[in-house]
């Protein structure tokens, strides 16, 4: 708790909460048509706006703010898959499936909600959320401790004496905390 910067991979948290709050019928469906047949069961507003991911995202965010009380907070977003890495290597993340429409619709709305709450957001169409979090961590870790929340193991390379990683499980309620000593002992 206290005087530190908390960086959240918003794309990772929203996706985790979206999939964690889906009806079982969608999770276990094999074909896209079967999944789409159950979209009406996903949490949504009376106007048909999907909200299951946003609901989980905000619930988790409020819990972190209440329990951890970070002095500074920023949420980073992936805006597109066509970042500088795809320009360098056309097949970068080429094996990923398309983002489901009910999830895709929630990104802009979640960003709007956070903007209305006054939460700092980091986004750039040429960079991924992990690039933005990494840059912020490197910029500020000499001034104050940095903690990063994500589900992405790629962030482990950012762990230092002053940068800690909170790595979410599939169940976003469970979070591993990676510090430099854990990262060093794991590599031995």
Where are the predicted features?
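Short beta-strand-loop/turn "lid" adjacent to the catalytic site in phosphate-handling enzymes
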Residues: 73-98
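Structural beta-sheet core signal
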Residues: 6, 74-77, 148, 167
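Generic hydrophobic, aliphatic-rich segments that mediate packing or membrane embedding
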Residues: 53, 57-60, 80, 85-88, ...
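Extended two-metal-dependent nuclease catalytic cores across DNA- and RNA-processing enzymes
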Residues: 30, 40-44, 94-188
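Short, glycine/charged-enriched secondary-structure capping and boundary segments
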Residues: 20-23, 89-91, 161-165
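Non-catalytic, usually N-terminal nucleic-acid engagement modules in DNA/RNA processing proteins
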Residues: 1-74, 84-87
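Residues immediately flanking
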Residues: 10, 79, 153
């Amino acid at each position: 708790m206290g005087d530190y910067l908390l960086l959240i991979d918003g794309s990772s948290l929203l996706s985790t909460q979206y999939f964690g709050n889906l009806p079982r019928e969608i999770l276990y469906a094999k074909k896209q048509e079967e999944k789409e047949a159950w979209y009406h069961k996903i949490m949504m507003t009376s106007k048909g706006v999907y909200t299951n991911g946003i609901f989980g995202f905000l619930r988790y965010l409020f819990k972190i703010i209440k329990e951890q009380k970070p002095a500074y907070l920023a949420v980073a977003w992936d805006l597109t898959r066509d970042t500088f890495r795809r320009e360098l290597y056309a097949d970068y993340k080429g094996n990923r499936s398309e983002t489901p429409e009910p999830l895709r619709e929630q990104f802009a709305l979640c960003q709007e909600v956070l903007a209305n709450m006054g939460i700092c957001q980091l986004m750039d169409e040429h960079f991924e959320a992990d690039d933005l979090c990494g840059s912020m961590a490197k910029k500020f870790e000499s001034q104050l401790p940095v903690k990063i929340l994500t589900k992405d193991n790629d962030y482990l390379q950012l762990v230092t004496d002053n940068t800690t990683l909170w790595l979410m499980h599939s169940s976003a309620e469970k979070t591993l905390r990676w510090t430099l000593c854990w990262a060093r002992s794991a590599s031995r």
